Amino acid sequence: MLRVNAADTAWFPADLELLAHPGIAAVVLPKAEHAEDVAVVHRASGGKPVLPLIESALGFEQRLSLAHAEGVQRLAFGHIDFQADMNMRATEDELLPFRVALVLASRLADIAPPIDGVTTALDDAELLRIDVLRARRLGFGGKLCIHPRQVVVVNACFTPDADEIAWAQRVIAADAAAGGAAVAVDGKMVDRPVVLRAQAILAEAAARKL
């Protein structure tokens, strides 16, 4: 995956010339604000997936347009630059509505769940774990890493654990056995959204060969 310079920089045209390289799987476009720029990247790359990085007020305002842009696989949230552009002194609570809005835009555009921004604390694995689990609860599908040693924690937190898999299996089995009748698992009613969640967990577990 290659991150190019922003479309309004002097280096962007030269970056476009590199995008057809066969070793590039996808392209990250920072400071993404216009669907037209995303389309330019997509075409220059020979049709590779593009991940617009939302890092500004304008980019956030254009989130649905960017999510629908040609070649977009998923959005990503650059919350540090976003805070600077918004003159925010934000904690995670203040950023919550912006994160949820990106998840919603991704769903409305029928693209993959977005990728959350980095955790800058390099030596705090617990803070990283908290950040990743929050992102997963909100509906994000991944998280940017600022250092290679963060990858293990991020992958682990986005991977269904044994308890989740066992719960999902119980839900699917109970729903099948009920034959359309009301059923409960672990004392909680199982309805269509619960079944869909269980199916998603098992699909992810299968994709990760768990």
Where is each model-derived feature located?
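Expand to "…catalyze enediolate/carbanion chemistry for C-C bond making/breaking, isomerization
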Residues: 1-210
